[in-house]
Amino acid sequence: MSLLRRWFDPIRSSWFYQKPSRQAVLPTEHGLSVYLRLDDVYSYLAVQQLPQLEDILADELKPLTVVISRQSGDAPNQMSAAEWQNYCIQDAQILAKQHRFSFHDSPEPPTAEALMQAEAILRHTPLRGQDFLYLLEDVFHMLWQKQSGKLRTLYAMASRHHQIQDFPERVFDDAPVLASYFEFGGRKYHAVDDLLRLTRRLKQQKLLTDNPIFLINHIEWREHLISDAEELNEIQALDPELDLYIALEDPISWLLLAYIKEELAAYYNIHLNVYPLSYHGRDWFDWSLATRLSKRTDVAFTPFCRPTEQATYQMAQLYYSAPEEQRVDAMYRILQAVWTRGQDLSFKAHFERMQRELELDQLTTADVTELLKENDMLCEMKSQPDFPVLELRIDGQSYVFNSLYRVWMIESIFSNVLEEKYKSENETETESVAQAHEQ
């Protein structure tokens, strides 16, 4: 590792963490924009929030600018276009169920003809402001709820009775949009995942005229969805198991493992398994994002020393040298040393100190590189767009998701499992009563 990184990373990261994480005011001269794609399922979720959002925007941010693109971006994490589309639809179904968005039980991407008709409707309509946003939502409903008859009728009316309109707050272009997002003050916010962060920012700058109420079933960090003792015992008795596939040079891996181990594992009796991955170049991360997430999750962070490829190998070597039953705790302590104490485990003195702390008399003779490759292959088979990748197993079912943005799914899944369990028990009880009456 570069001597500069070993010396200066801990100093710089501590300073960065302690400085104010937000500039006082983001510029408003370019207003607030939302970027959509008619065949993007996240855009479908986003448009269901737009009328309410625009209704509480301060006048200086009105009208909300709507940018509609025909072009998708490249799928992330070397996923194929089909894998990405399948992932998005499944993820959107989960978000829709959690936050009560309207969504079809078996959604399908819109056809090319439907997309052409939808764009023509939106280009021709003279509606503006709230009226346009309600039309936009209706058009997305038609596209994603398989309402082709309604769409054809509206298309015929729009193309027959109206000319193409040209409004500055309505933009059609081919700039790639992978998934819907907002843009404000030069910053991008994921349309669903970052919506609450965006509204917090707008509220801080007094750019909202009323309190925002979005994503009503959002689960806050360090708040448990299940607190009833009986329900908690039922989840614990199901022995849930959680696999974590983590890139060791990625600070999100530390934040996620620490949060789950400190807050969820013992509480819900979750058995953790950790699968370290080979180096993926994620040491070049967004420092401000990692800092903000650490404060939101209330997980210790900085001073850190970003691991290089060599350092991640040394970290994995220590992990696999620990007894199997102690490996999760070993990984927690290894990542803690790197991300909260600025240890460089490619540096011999730091490595040997960590080895002593873990009480490892000897290092593993296993081929660590091969073990990491096996983990990479297992992780790739999950077809997820981002790291860390999580797989939760409970009550005979398996659930795969990814990133710190989806940690809330653990508790949401537990709640759904209990709901289905009670529903099944009630149905069985009802059937038993009915049979008794028949006899």
Task: Report residues per predicted region.
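C-terminal cap of thioredoxin/glutaredoxin-like
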Residues: 3-7, 11-12, 18, 27-32, ...
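Short pre-active-site segment immediately N-terminal to redox-active cysteine/selenocysteine motifs
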Residues: 36-39, 246-249
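Short, well-ordered beta-to-alpha junction loops that form the rim of enzyme active sites
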Residues: 37, 108, 184-186, 306
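Structural alpha/beta surface segment adjacent to cysteine/selenocysteine redox centers
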Residues: 45-143, 254-341, 421, 433-436
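An acidic- and aromatic-residue-enriched active-site/binding cleft used to recognize and process polar
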Residues: 66-68, 194, 247, 277-279, ...
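Residue-level preference for long, well-ordered alpha-helices that form the structural scaffold
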Residues: 81-84, 88, 160, 249, ...
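Phosphate-binding P-loop
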Residues: 236
